[in-house]
């Protein structure tokens, strides 16, 4: 099975776009909607692209579920330590409150960009990446063997919160999201566990997200997930047209807000 090799060049370095004359600290681009918008617009202008992309890390959803995230000026937000000791602790967590915390700032930032008629793509983290900020991978892997039904319940909880997040974004005027789950990869999970994860967790989640957008939006899908689904016979790629909506992999958005030079993933 082909595993897409993520390169450092694939990662956007927002620190390079931070203007030292700004009267606030770098870490505030992660915590304040207006400063997030300023950074996103600055990045768009300096890199001569036609859209803004927010937020700038993969820790927002996890933090909103209770993860302990450290936000600094010299590094990107990262998990300080896992809050949950057992799977039951994850199940006991409150669902995301979309009116408070950093996730509310992301939603507001997206709405501000939409109000300015600026194309915005919101980065949405996948369930495994979110879960790794809440509980040790060792505990999760043990759960696969000892309590598979509990693992299913945990992923359902995470997925339900992701779907609700996308519903809120959609109501705010967002029509494009970028979906990635960096830790759901072949080197980390191995072929058997990855196959099961893609089929039982990612596939139903992506179907739910597609149902939310219908023909009015686009999900830009991480190549790792794309090639994983294809490799295990759960999907296939077809060339896209400029009017197509849905799941886009290896696609881009041009200045006319149409999709080009890419392919769409059909989930079988």
Stretches with model-predicted labels:
Residues 56-58, 126-128, 183-185, 223-227:
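Active-site-proximal loop/turn and secondary-structure-junction residues that shape catalytic pockets
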Residues 44, 113, 162, 169, ...:
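Conserved, mostly hydrophobic/aromatic
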């Amino acid at each position: 099975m082909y595993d897409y090799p993520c390169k450092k060049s694939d990662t956007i370095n927002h620190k390079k776009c931070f203007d030292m004359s700004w009267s606030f600290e770098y870490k505030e681009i992660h915590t304040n909607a207006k400063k997030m918008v300023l950074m996103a617009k600055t990045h768009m202008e300096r890199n001569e692209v036609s859209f803004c992309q927010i937020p700038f890390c993969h820790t927002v959803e996890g933090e909103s579920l209770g993860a302990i995230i450290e936000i600094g000026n010299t590094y990107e937000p990262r998990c300080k330590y896992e809050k949950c000791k057992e799977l039951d602790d994850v199940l006991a967590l409150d669902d995301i409150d979309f009116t408070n915390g950093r996730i509310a700032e992301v939603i507001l930032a997206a709405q501000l960009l939409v109000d300015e008629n600026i194309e915005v793509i919101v980065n949405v983290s996948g369930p495994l990446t979110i879960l790794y900020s809440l509980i040790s991978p060792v505990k999760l892997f043990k759960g696969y063997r000892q309590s598979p039904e509990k693992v299913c319940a945990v992923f359902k909880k995470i997925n339900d919160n992701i779907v609700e997040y996308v519903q809120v974004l959609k109501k705010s005027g967002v029509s494009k999201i970028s979906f990635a789950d960096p830790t759901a990869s072949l080197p980390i999970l191995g072929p058997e566990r990855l196959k099961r994860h893609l089929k039982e967790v990612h596939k139903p989640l992506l179907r739910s997200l597609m149902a939310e957008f219908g023909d009015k939006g686009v999900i830009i899908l991480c190549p790792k997930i794309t090639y994983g689904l294809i490799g295990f016979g759960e999907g296939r790629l077809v060339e896209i047209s400029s009017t197509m909506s849905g799941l886009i992999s290896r696609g881009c958005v041009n200045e006319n807000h149409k999709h080009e030079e890419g392919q769409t993933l059909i989930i079988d």
